[in-house]
């Protein structure tokens, strides 16, 4: 893993969340490597609609699983979500707030930058 991973804007990747502690490496960032098959690369500010949709679709982000270092999420938490789940949610019409500066460049393999920008909350 590189120490200077990039975001979807081509800049240094910013921290997503330390509380709850997120990331494939549980380092607070949406860093990734070849072992991250799910591409946990999109920094999302989750909301109840997104969490409920994910749970109903088979990806329960609400229930804590301490054995995996997963605290369970609530409305307003920031979390590194799998790019494929974000793509599915957006296709289903489920909106979520996305931080582009905190979202890893590899996300663009699954979700176009134009789509991400529609839901971005950190563009000025």
Give names to the regions the model predicted.
Residues 1-49, 113, 120-122:
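Extended boundary segments
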Residues 45-60:
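Short, basic/aromatic beta-hairpin or loop at an interaction surface
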Residues 62-69:
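Short alpha-helix capping/helix-loop boundary micro-motifs
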Residues 86-109:
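Short, compositionally biased
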Residues 104-124:
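Glycine- and charge-enriched low-complexity intrinsically disordered segments
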